[in-house]
Every structure is written in structure tokens, then in C-alpha cells.
């Protein structure tokens, strides 16, 4: 089966590359199949974006914003349809994908506000003229989308980039082609001019062709650290290309004494297991204080975790989690659990595959407190490592003992401890008595170290979608009353 899965220069076309197939995570039924875009089609997409750039970037910003607002309105009309598409190909429950669509809709207004506040135009009056600050789009930008939020996360790059006046080539994850296709159809319906947004579907070869294309002025990426590092190496020695990397994390959640144990456990579960552990901000390491209170927290956490039953995305009543993205992801997580056990980790709740040929996994908790060298890896799924500590200094040292730096958090009634954490944590997101997976659309989103390259997204996405232009201007040119030393203008 091959059909028109790529949108280039305002036309839907068939791919000329290798065949790609999307399987249902739940039962491995074929959901989607097409040929990927080959290198020549990627070049055509980049050329179409370049051809469309001048007209799009020279439109008044108000006209570009009208298209974005129309897209948001169409999203609202089609929100249930798109939520079901996302659920189908990710296996996330409908309750969660519905919230993803709402985030996509809200991104329009918040991005317009951020563009005005962070990259709009300003003027300062000076004694002999004016100082102007304006912002200009980069040009043609490549957007690489992840599979865990196939609607919301690419949308968080696409909308700010379009508002700024850029044109785009979008390469989604090959694991979520349907969401990308349906989203681009809404952009087309919204009246986005031909060539402004182009879609190329495919796997590694398609992505490599896009990264290597000389027409690309910038790359916006959300995904794994390994892939992000690969992108960084490929673009090494090309400082003229803007690169924004939002990668993963080996995030630590510190639990201090807290009277309401159930509230603490609820926050832990929301931090570690929501989206089947497939959020980049999910807690990977749980740090619990030694003592009777910590023991009680762990006992209750085990009880609650054992009762989490993954199920089909449209099951009634709705499950807390569905499956992970693929059978390969299942295998990777089971192997990770096995490696940790061989290192001396003790499984308190075993991560298990619910049935063959399904990606439904029961969440796992493994105590690695006695493991000498815990691997500094992001296990992207419902596998939580438990570590015990005695003092807050020790907990802080453990939390910071990672090459990543995306998120960390604290469950504690003690504001002074949070103050210390916020001063000393090496992370871009630091939460207190809130899930690690919670974030504000009015704040930047990103990390340091192996979690990113200091190009946070969300409210700060406007920053990497445009470059500043500073100007000194005067309406008239006059000879100054006092000349520079050594200059003479004879009568």
C-alpha cells in the first residue's frame, strides 16, 4: 500500500523511498503504510519552503496570526477525531490525548503572547535619534517531532516558528505518522500558503537527508539524548544554523517526611507512570528518606502501583495508562530491568508484559539503593528506580549525580528545603509538591547538560524562532556641533 503521505509545495504526493509501516501498539495490527520520502523529495520540500519564505515572512504579522488562529479553531472542531488518532497510534488513553489536543489549541494564544513579549518590536528615544529592536525569522527550519506527544510537541515548534515568519519542513517520528498527516491537513484547511509547511514522512534516512540539506537554516528537535547528540555532531562546524535540542532526563524526585502519605504517593505515581512513563520529565529515580515514614511511603506506593492495570485506549472505565510505543520499547525496558537486577537491584514491583504482541506493561519499581554504580540512563517507560538517603545533602548530591539536567522535584512541607533545592539543583525544571510532569505554558521548558543546549521551548520558543536586529536611526542627518578629534571641515 502506497498513498500520498507527503505534503510538499502544497501538494500531497506518494513517497519514493523505502516502505514504512505503523503497527498498533495494542495488537500489532497495521494502522498505516506508505513509502517514505527519499532524498530528492526532501530536497524538493526544502526548496518549496525556500520559495515560500519571502512572501510568508513579508506578510504583516497580523496576517500570519490569522492563519494560526484559524488552525486553532479547526483543532477545536476536530479535537475528538484527532484525539482518537493519537490514541490509536500511541495507545495513550483517550482522557490523556484529549488533554493533548487542548494543549495544542492553547498553544496558539500563548505563542502569540510570547512572540509579542519576547521578540516583538521596541523603540528607545535617544538624544540624537532612536534605538530600534526588531526580530527577523531565520528562514527555512526543520522540525523533528517525537512520538510521545505527536501532536503537542511538534505544535510547540511549528506555531512559534510560523508566527515569526519562518517556513518549515516537518519530519515526524516514523512511529506516529498518522497524527502528523491529520495535523498538516488542518493547516492546509486553515489557509496556510503552499510551501510554508511541508511534511516528509520517514525514518532515519529521511531525517538524515533533511539535516544535510543546505537550504535548512535551523533545526528544532524534541526527542532522545542519543538522537539529539547525533544531530549536534552532524551540524558541528555550522554555527550559521540555529539548533534547538529538547532531550530527555534521568529525573530525580526527592521525598521528605510528609504527613499525607496518599497525597505523596499520588504525586509520585503521576510523576513516574503517567503516559506509561513516556514523558521526558517523568521521574526515573525516586529518592526516599530512610526511616519509618519513608518505609510507609514505599509500602503504600507498592500497593497503589500493583493496582495499576494498563488497558486499551478506549476501554471503559478509562485506564490510567495504556502501552508503550512499540514492541522494541517493551524489549528495551525488560532488558533494562534485568540489567539492574543483575547489578543487585531488588524489584519491589516487577515490570511485566501483560500479553505477547502487546505493548501493555505493568509499572515496575526496583530498589537500587545497594547498587554501587547505577547506570545514568533514561529508561523511557514505567520503570522507577528507588534510592534511599539519610540527609538532604545526600539526596541533593544523588539528584545532581547525572549527566542530564531536565527536571527534579521535592515532596516536603519544608519550604527551606525547596529553597535549597532551587539554589543547588542542576535542572531546568524544579517543582515542589507538584508532579515532575507538570509544567506551565507561561514558563520556559527545557534542561541543561545532556537534556538540552540552552534553547528551552514553551514560552521561550519565540527566542529560537527569530534573531534580533538592533538599529540606531535618525530621521535627518546633521553635522554635530562638536567634531571628533582630528577632524576639520574648513569653510
Curated annotation (Swiss-Prot):
Record-linked Pfam families: Aldedh (PF00171)
- Cite the CDD domains for this sequence: ALDH_SGSD_AstD (cd07095)
Q: What residue intervals traverse the membrane?
A: none
Give residues annotated as binding NAD(+).
Answer: 223-228
Question: According to its UniProt record, in which pathway does this protein act?
Answer: Amino-acid degradation; L-arginine degradation via AST pathway; L-glutamate and succinate from L-arginine: step 4/5
Enzyme Commission no: 1.2.1.71
- Which cystines does this chain contain? none
UniProt keyword terms in alphabetical order = Arginine metabolism, NAD, Oxidoreductase
Q: Which domain of life is it from?
A: Bacteria
Q: Which GO terms describe its molecular function?
A: succinylglutamate-semialdehyde dehydrogenase activity
Protein purpose: Catalyzes the NAD-dependent reduction of succinylglutamate semialdehyde into succinylglutamate.
Q: Which PANTHER family does this UniProt record tie to the protein? A: SUCCINATE-SEMIALDEHYDE DEHYDROGENASE, MITOCHONDRIAL (PTHR43353:SF5)
Q: Which HAMAP family match?
A: Aldedh_AstD (MF_01174)
Q: What is this protein called?
A: N-succinylglutamate 5-semialdehyde dehydrogenase
**What gene is this protein a product of?**
astD
Amino acid at each position: 500500500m502506497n498513498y500520498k503521505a507527503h505534503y510538499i509545495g502544497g501538494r500531497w504526493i506518494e513517497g519514493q523511498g523505502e516502505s514504512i509501516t505503523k503497527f498498533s501498539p495494542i495488537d500489532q495490527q497495521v494502522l498505516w503504510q506508505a513509502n517514505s520520502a527519499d532524498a530528492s523529495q526532501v530536497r524538493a520540500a526544502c526548496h518549496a519552503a525556500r520559495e515560500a519564505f519571502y512572501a510568508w515572512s513579508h506578510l504583516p504579522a497580523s496576517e500570519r496570526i490569522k492563519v494560526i488562529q484559524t488552525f486553532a479553531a479547526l483543532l477545536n472542531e476536530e479535537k475528538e477525531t484527532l484525539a482518537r488518532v493519537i490514541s490509536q497510534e500511541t495507545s495513550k488513553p483517550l482522557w490523556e490525548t484529549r488533554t493533548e489536543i487542548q494543549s495544542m489549541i492553547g498553544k496558539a494564544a500563548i505563542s502569540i503572547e510570547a512572540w509579542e513579549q519576547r521578540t516583538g518590536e521596541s523603540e528607545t528615544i535617544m538624544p540624537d535619534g532612536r534605538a530600534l529592536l526588531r526580530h527577523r525569522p531565520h528562514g527555512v527550519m526543520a522540525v523533528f517531532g517525537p512520538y510521545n506527544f505527536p501532536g503537542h510537541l511538534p505544535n510547540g515548534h511549528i506555531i512559534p516558528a510560523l508566527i515569526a515568519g519562518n517556513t518549515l519542513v516537518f519530519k515526524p517520528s516514523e512511529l506516529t505518522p498518522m497524527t502528523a498527516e491529520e495535523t498538516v491537513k488542518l493547516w492546509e484547511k486553515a489557509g496556510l500558503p503552499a510551501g510554508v509547511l511541508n511534511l516528509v514522512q520517514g525514518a532515519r534516512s529521511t531525517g538524515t537527508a533533511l539535516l544535510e540539506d543546505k537550504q535548512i537554516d535551523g533545526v528544532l528537535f524534541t526527542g532522545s539524548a542519543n538522537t539529539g547528540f547525533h544531530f549536534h555532531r552532524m551540524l558541528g562546524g555550522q554555527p550559521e544554523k540555529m539548533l534547538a535540542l529538547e532531550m530527555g532526563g534521568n529525573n530525580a524526585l526527592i521525598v521528605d517526611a510528609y504527613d499525607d502519605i496518599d497525597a505523596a504517593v499520588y504525586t509520585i505515581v503521576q510523576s513516574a507512570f503517567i503516559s506509561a512513563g513516556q514523558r521526558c520529565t517523568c521521574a526515573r529515580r525516586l529518592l526516599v528518606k530512610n526511616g519509618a515514614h519513608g518505609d510507609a511511603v514505599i509500602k503504600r506506593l507498592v500497593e497503589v502501583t500493583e493496582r495499576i492495570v494498563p488497558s486499551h485506549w478506549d476501554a471503559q472505565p478509562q485506564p490510567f495508562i495504556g502501552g508503550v510505543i512499540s514492541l522494541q520499547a517493551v524489549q528495551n525496558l525488560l532488558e533494562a530491568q534485568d540489567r539492574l537486577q543483575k547489578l543487585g537491584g531488588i524489584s519491589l514491583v516487577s515490570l511485566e508484559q501483560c500479553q505477547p504482541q502487546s505493548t501493555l506493561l505493568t509499572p515496575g519499581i526496583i530498589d537500587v539503593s545497594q547498587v554501587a554504580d547505577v547506570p545514568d540512563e533514561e529508561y523511557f517507560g514505567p520503570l522507577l528506580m528507588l534510592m534511599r538517603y539519610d540527609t538532604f545533602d545526600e539526596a541533593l548530591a544523588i539528584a545532581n549525580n547525572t549527566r542530564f539536567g531536565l527536571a527534579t522535584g521535592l515532596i516536603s512541607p519544608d519550604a527551606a528545603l525547596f529553597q535549597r533545592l532551587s539554589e543547588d539543583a542542576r535542572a531546568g525544571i524544579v517543582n515542589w509538591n507538584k508532579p515532575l510532569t507538570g509544567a506551565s505554558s507561561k514558563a520556559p521548558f527545557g534542561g541543561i547538560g545532556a537534556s538540552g543546549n540552552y534553547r528551552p521551548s514553551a514560552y521561550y520558543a519565540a527566542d529560537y524562532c527569530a534573531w534580533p536586529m538592533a538599529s540606531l536611526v535618525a530621521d535627518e542627518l546633521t553635522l554635530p556641533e562638536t567634531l571628533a578629534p582630528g577632524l576639520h571641515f574648513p569653510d
